[in-house]
Amino acid sequence: MSEIAHQDHSEKKAFLVNSSSLRDVRSFCRGVFEKLQINNDLKEELVLAIAEAAQNIVKHAFKNNADSNELMVVQISCESNKL
């Protein structure tokens, strides 16, 4: 049984590098994974992994600098049934 629907799709979005963007990162990821028809368990694991990576960028790379105008870009692509 396939975990991912057979379709090619790519989306990316830029977010400000601050902790208030993390909810938007999760929402964006969930939306893309829903379009790809990924099962709920896998979707939530992927959202968690991407959100943790984004949180590490905010926490470690920018030291929780709320004044940062820097952007982080999340891109999710599926080609030939591969994320």
Kindly label every feature range from the protein language model:
Residues 52, 56:
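Conserved polar catalytic motif of the HATPase_c/GHKL fold
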Residues 21, 34, 66-68:
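A generic structural signal for solvent-exposed, polar alpha-helical segments
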Residues 27-51:
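Conserved short strand/loop->alpha-helix "switch" segment adjacent to the catalytic nucleotide/phosphoryl-transfer site
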Residues 17, 38-41, 69, 78:
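Structural signature of the histidine kinase catalytic ATP-binding subdomain
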Residues 1-12, 57-83:
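Conserved beta-strand-loop-beta-strand hairpin that lines the nucleotide-binding pocket
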Residues 11-24:
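STAS-typified acidic loop motif
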